């Protein structure tokens, strides 16, 4: 099975942004869904068990931040000054989760009041979580 690369995702993102076409956005989602893992940033905590994927508030709405590769996750975490994402030795903690598990996690967050998902924040795309089931259906049908 073909696995998407960061570069492909960037190209698909540019295309979807410039064309605004549904099928270009669907291609982008498809590429993201085909990745073996999705990556989350998490704050440093005393107990590893307490670490949870970062949910940030933008426009007064809680969003879950997801990254298509570890490097992007680290880059974004470093932009948040005093966010607690970078440890004393300068490492960012990234949680990598198998994509099907990550999707289940995102779907479960809807009931916890999380509004949406933001992929590759800095240069990415986003969607309300309530649209996720329809996106999954649409992409998996295609």
Predicted feature locations:
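An interfacial alpha-helical scaffold signature
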Residues: 1-142
